Amino acid sequence: MKLVGSYTSPFVRKLSILLLEKGITFEFINELPYNADNGVAQFNPLGKVPVLVTEEGECWFDSPIIAEYIELMNVAPAMLPRDPLESLRVRKIEALADGIMDAGLVSVREQARPAAQQSEDELLRQREKINRSLDVLEGYLVDGTLKTDTVNLATIAIACAVGYLNFRRVAPGWCVDRPHLVKLVENLFSRESFARTEPPKA
């Protein structure tokens, strides 16, 4: 099994962590989708990462589909509840965390443009998306929808999203007034799977 992606992608990191937590052996193929000579399109015609390539050569994309495929392999520990509705609730929170990653990626791309071409309105929109979503996640931790000691698909996605914000210095004050969220990500960052997938220093 091969995972095609970039070491800096939070979506790729989420899937690497799922595989590591389940003890599933895989080969990592480092491809930078924004490089002109990248080989991603041979695995995904959209040219996007991550892509999971099975032993039979079947290619799975994108991130939520791959996460579901990994879970369907029925390798312990389970990262989704057995109950379909509870599982869908976890997937909803995963989608929220993935949205934070998307907003972070858009912010990074916007800030990479020449200063005169950057849109402050666009950056503000993305910051607002991130902050609203982080507030909702903090609320889930306060009301018990999420717990700080839980390891599942949703909490892994949340920690990968926050890890990306830290890595790219997007929303630098995210931890202010969100103590439960801080506790959750600290617990997850201490796990071996997170240590092994930490993005390389610039």
Curated annotation (Swiss-Prot):
UniProt GO MF annotations: glutathione transferase activity; maleylacetoacetate isomerase activity
InterPro entries named in the record: Glutathione-S-Trfase_C-like, Glutathione-S-Trfase_C_sf, Glutathione_S-Trfase_N, GST_C, Thioredoxin-like_sf
Pfam families named among the record's database cross-references: GST_C (PF00043), GST_N_2 (PF13409)
Annotated GST C-terminal domain residues: 83-202
GST N-terminal domain: residues covered: 1-78
Stored Gene3D superfamilies: 1.20.1050.10, Glutaredoxin (3.40.30.10)
Gene Ontology biological process terms, A to Z: glutathione metabolic process; L-phenylalanine catabolic process
Residues annotated for glutathione binding in this entry: 9, 49, 62-63
GO cellular component: cytosol
Stated role: Glutathione (GSH) transferase homolog, that might be involved in selenium metabolism.
Similarity comment: Belongs to the GST superfamily. HSP26 family.
The name this protein goes by in its record: Uncharacterized GST-like protein YibF
Protein's organism: Escherichia coli (strain K12)
Recorded name of the encoding gene: yibF
